[in-house]
Structures are given as C-alpha cells and as structure tokens.
Design a protein with these regions (language model features):
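C-terminal motif of bacterial Sec signal peptides marking the signal peptidase cleavage site
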Residues: 14-19
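Bacterial lipoprotein signal-peptidase II cleavage site
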Residues: 21-31
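Short, glycine-/small- and polar/acidic-enriched structural segments
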Residues: 37-198, 202, 211, 215, ...
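Second-shell loop/turn segments in exported
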Residues: 46-47, 134, 166-168, 207-211, ...
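Solvent-exposed, polar/charged alpha-helical surfaces in well-ordered, non-transmembrane soluble domains
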Residues: 59, 126, 161, 176-180, ...
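Periplasmic-binding protein-like
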Residues: 140-150, 229-261, 268-272
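Secondary-structure end/capping motifs
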Residues: 260-312
C-alpha cells in the first residue's frame, strides 16, 4: 500500500468516527452546539501546536490556510490566513519536536496560554490527567501509525513475539509511554529500550541495521528507502497498535479550564466542523497544502527531509 493511500485510510477512519459521534444533543452541548457556534469568538491568531516537523499527517490542520502561508525557520511557526468561514483570522501551526524541547502537547497547552489546541495521544492524556489534564475535541487519526521499524536483512520479525528473543535495541523518544507497556507485558526487556532518540536518522544509519527505531508507518519507511541516501533500502516495521497498545494518536485537545469559557466553547462549535471539512478537503486535493508543507520543511533546513515524491 502506498504512503498516500495508507495516510488517507487512517484519516478516513477518524472522520467516520467523528461523523458517528457528532449527532446527539449532549455532544453538541459539549462542543458548543450549532446554536452557540461562532467563529468570531476564536482568538486571532488561532494557534495549534503539533508534535513534530511539518508533514502530511497534520495535513488537515495545515489545510486550514488552503496552502497559503509561510514558516518562521527559527520558531517553526507556520502562519497563514484561515481559508474557511467568513470571519478573518490568522492560523498559526507550530512545529513540535526540537522546536519545543520535545515537550508533549499537554505540557505546551499549560506553558503557553496562547495555544488553543494541541496534538496529544491517549496514553499521555491518561498519564498526565492529574497534573496536566486535557480534553480531546477531534480525533485526526483513528489507527495509531506509530511503529518500531527494523532492517529486514538483520531481523526477520513477523510479530511482536519475535522482538524480545532477538535482544535488539529499540531506539525511542524519552517518555514514550508504550515502552512501559512493552516491558510490563514481557514483549521486550527493559535493557532493550534506549530512550535517547532525537528524531535524526544518524544513529540508525550508523548502526547499519543493528538496532530498531520508532517511527510512523506513514513516514519513515518511505523516507529511509527513498529520501535518506545514507540508508537507501527498504525497512520493515511492527505497528505499536498490534502489540495491544491501542490508543488514539494525534487527537486535537484543549485544556478543560478553557472549556468553562463560553466564548471558547462557541469558537470550538465553529472550528471543529471546519477542521473536519479541512481534513476531507485535504484528502480530496492534497496538492496545494502538501506543497506548502514541503516548502516549510525546505525553509527549516534541518535534518528532517521530505521530497515531492514522498509527500505525494
């Protein structure tokens, strides 16, 4: 399955779920309801923080500007005019990862009051519920695309049952909650997990297949085979979801205290349907927004790379 088809499938599942869950009076009240929906109640700019560099996995959010806008290479903030509705607003989509010290979305929502929505995963929401509670308002992806990828010439893993016996090191980001689950269930040994991953391909390339590494099914397998010349060959992977760790990945969330504000609720009543429509529009015609995402990555000029062929 191509990268584009896989991403579209993941996004489609999320949109079907959103449609099925949006028809009751109780749900309408929680989101502000059609009667209270007011885009003019939204802040200007509308700030949304992601958890990584610009990429198509956030296509529905970048689509809010219809492909218009530019990125600040220093801050990683992409800014452009809202292309939906009749209320003039600027949209600011902030890159995550190294631009924010690899902080999770929950932490960013509490450290910067200007941020309206941030990307969070279910596992981090549960873990941080006491100290940094969040409420998800839109599931952008239904099937968690997180993976552990590996060199098929080194390891012939067919399922998670093969990983522990191999003794392979799993290079992950620090604070990846699924690693605690993998250890607790005996799928891997604690000493196999190395939480020093910084998002760069350098370590995986240098180890020449000796280690496994976290990634996204919709991103790294293509990049390593086609865009990262130091590797330049296929990788295989196991989905984290197939280990039994089933979460919503990259849901857009807000601080619960902000939901007590009637204006914020009215804003969300208008903005969430726009986010849904933008996601549909991105799947139907991703070209302009993908071009903007690709240009943003070029302008950032970092270790993270995308190609025109890859982003399609």
């Amino acid at each position: 399955m191509s990268r584009t088809r896989l991403l579209a499938l993941l996004l489609t599942f999320a949109l079907v779920l959103a449609a099925c869950a949006s028809g009751t009076d109780e749900d309408d009240a929680a989101a502000g309801g059609d009667g209270g929906a007011d885009l003019a109640a939204c802040p200007d700019p509308i700030v949304i923080t992601t958890d990584w560099f610009p990429e198509s996995e956030y296509g529905g959010v970048y689509q809010l500007t219809g492909g218009e806008g530019s990125i600040d290479p220093e801050s990683g903030a992409f800014t452009g005019p809202l292309a939906y509705g009749d209320v003039p607003r600027q949209v600011e989509v902030r890159a995550g990862g190294p631009f924010v010290g690899f902080q999770p979305g929950s932490a960013l929502l509490y450290s910067d009051d200007d941020i309206l929505l941030g990307f969070v995963n279910t596992d981090s929401q549960i873990t941080l519920a006491d100290s940094q509670p969040t409420v998800a308002v839109f599931a952008t992806i239904e099937v968690n695309p997180q993976i552990i990828m590996f060199d098929p010439e080194t390891y012939d893993w067919e399922s998670w049952d093969d990983v522990r016996e191999s003794g392979a090191v799993l290079l992950t980001f620090g604070g990846a909650f699924y690693t605690d689950y993998l250890i607790a269930t005996g799928l891997v040994d604690a000493e196999q997990v190395d939480p020093s991953y910084d998002g760069s391909p350098a370590r995986f390339n240098a180890e020449n297949g000796a280690i496994a590494q976290q990634g996204f099914a919709t991103q790294e397998p293509y990049n390593y085979e086609n865009d990262f010349e130091d590797w330049g060959r296929p990788v295989d992977y196991l989905l984290i979801q197939d280990s039994g760790w089933e979460i919503y990945s990259q849901a857009l969330a807000i601080r619960p205290d902000k939901l007590e504000d009637e204006g914020v609720r009215s804003c969300l009543g208008a903005l969430v349907p726009i986010l849904q429509q933008a996601s549909v529009d991105f799947m139907e015609d991703p070209g302009p927004t993908n071009a903007a995402i690709l240009q943003a990555v070029i302008d950032l000029d970092s270790f993270w790379v995308l190609s025109e062929a890859g982003i399609e």
